């Protein structure tokens, strides 16, 4: 199709990212996959630059993320670096690499942050720092890019039923009104892209709050 658009979505293999990819593909997008580890910045830059020689990017969705909720002194230095690299550094670098292409297409950047970027919770200092950093990056970047026609949106989902919780000490309750599902976030992405004007920041929450300890 002549009006096919091109998107790059990180974290595409599971959870919210996988739902976003499936939904984009039903809405006239071809999703280009990155195979490089996001914390390997040298290889990542090489792969992105290779893709940009073939495609003009219409949409970048920074969705990949890791979580840890534990007393800060118990977190290893390597885990601190890994969370910062995946949750914050990689989206900033990918945006930097793709911005000229996005300006050309007057495209859109969507950052999947977290409800934790909007509040302060115990045992969440590291995770919240990375996600609030991503949120502020997006909000500032929108102001920078307004004249270019590039939209920037941050989505802050609350508890979403995905494998994100596999290695954590808690998970969403089994009650359906206490968690979101990935498809809700994916539909929100489409709504954002179809909105006249720019939704710069949106928080999505279930009606009730309840978690289950493992």
What are the residue ranges of the model-derived segments?
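N-terminal Rossmann NAD(P)H-binding glycine-rich loop of SDR-like oxidoreductase domains
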Residues: 13, 21
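Conserved NAD(P)H cofactor-binding loop of Rossmann-fold oxidoreductase domains
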Residues: 63-69
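Substrate-binding pocket helix/loop in short-chain dehydrogenase/reductase
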Residues: 71-72, 79-84
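Active-site helix of classical SDR
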Residues: 95, 130
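Alpha-helical segment proximal to the catalytic Tyr-Lys
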Residues: 100, 139, 143-147
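Residue(s) in the substrate-gating loop at a strand-loop-helix junction
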Residues: 114
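C-terminal helical subdomain
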Residues: 154-155, 172-213
């Amino acid at each position: 199709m002549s009006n096919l658009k091109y998107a790059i979505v990180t974290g595409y293999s599971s959870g919210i990212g996988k739902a976003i990819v499936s939904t984009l593909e039903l809405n006239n997008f071809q999703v280009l996959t990155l195979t490089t580890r996001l914390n390997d910045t040298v290889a990542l830059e090489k792969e992105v630059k290779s893709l940009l020689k073939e495609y003009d990017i219409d949409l970048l969705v920074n969705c990949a993320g890791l979580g840890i909720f534990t007393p800060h002194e118990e977190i290893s230095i390597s885990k601190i670096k890994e969370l910062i690299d995946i949750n914050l550094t990689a989206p900033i670098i990918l945006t930097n690499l793709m911005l000229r292409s996005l300006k050309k297409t007057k495209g859109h950047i969507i950052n999947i942050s977290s409800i934790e970027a909007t509040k302060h919770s115990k045992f969440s200092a590291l995770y919240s720092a990375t996600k609030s950093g991503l949120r502020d990056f997006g909000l500032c970047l929108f102001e920078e890019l307004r004249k270019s026609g590039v939209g920037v949106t941050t989505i802050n989902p609350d508890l979403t039923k995905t494998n994100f919780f596999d290695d954590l000490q808690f998970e969403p309750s089994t009650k359906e009104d206490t968690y979101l599902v990935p498809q809700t976030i994916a539909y929100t992405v489409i709504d954002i892209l179809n909105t006249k004007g720019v939704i710069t920041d949106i928080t999505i929450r279930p009606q009730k709050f309840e978690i289950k300890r493992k």
